[in-house]
Amino acid sequence: MHSLDLKEKFIDEMKLKVDNVNDHYLINSFYYERKRGNVEGLYTAVWDAKSDQLISQNFVPMGDSVRSLAKTDGPDRSALNDFFIRDVILKKDGSFILIAEDYYTQSRALPWNRYDYLYGYPSISPYYYNYYSPYSYGYYGRPGYYNNNNSVRYYYNNVLILNQDNTGQLESGSVIRKTQFDDGDDNFLSYAIMLAGGQLHFLFNELERRTQLLNDQSVSGSGKVTRNPPLKSLDKGYIFMPRYAKQVSASEIIVPCIYRNYVCFAKIEY
């Protein structure tokens, strides 16, 4: 067992990624200066598997430029408070891309609070996994927190993409702008990632003229965001569930969808 010196800072939801190419363990988390405070930035630690010791540890504060870019609304100071780490993509040289999404809920029963969301509200059992973790989507379903799906509205907004070197220092940042919400469940919200042509393609639903269109925005290695034409279904009535999608080859991704209460699968080729 090993301990990490957090220098009197607070972190939540540590994400562990195994780098088999470089024999490293990569640890990432958002951090705070005080308990229940605002998210200040990103904590990154790199542990070497061969020597069994810490190689680097950094607390990287997020400046006003990143906060202004990431926020949906509200002051810059609290801009990152609703962001959760979703993906970490490793590169051969040990650097990586970290992807976080703006997520929160609204309910008549309880107010939203990041700390309560992660570690449990006194009136809700911490063993209720759907409440405890923002990543427990279930199998094509997610029950409401309060046994009443209609009382919960889910919000999935901007996606923050951070390019970082092999010690966790920030090199560049980009944002995919989106606004998504739904009542009762979040099966059709969030995004999928498709790596094709040296770019990260983000696929997500967006409501346009009462029709859910599967949008495609791509991010290049330099951080440039390109808005591509929507992937319009040839047949009406199909609603995609991109969060459950799976890339199956260098040019193909399988996306589950719903059609007249049936689950089916669409194959998208690049």
Please report, for each region that a protein language model flagged, where it lies by residue.
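Short beta-strand elements that form the blades of beta-propeller/WD-repeat-like
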Residues: 22-35, 45, 87, 94-106, ...
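Terminal, non-catalytic domain-edge segments
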Residues: 92, 259-270
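Beta-propeller blade signature
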Residues: 39-53, 117-132, 144-169, 215-223, ...
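Conserved blade-ending motifs and adjacent loop-strand segments that build the rim/top face
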Residues: 2-16, 54-86, 170-192, 221-250
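Beta-propeller domains
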Residues: 1-114, 147, 155-157
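C-terminal structural cap/anchor segments
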Residues: 126, 130-145, 163-206, 210
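Flexible, surface-exposed loop regions and adjacent strand-edge segments
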Residues: 114-118, 179
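Intrinsically disordered, low-complexity acidic/polar segments
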Residues: 36-37, 53, 107, 170-171, ...
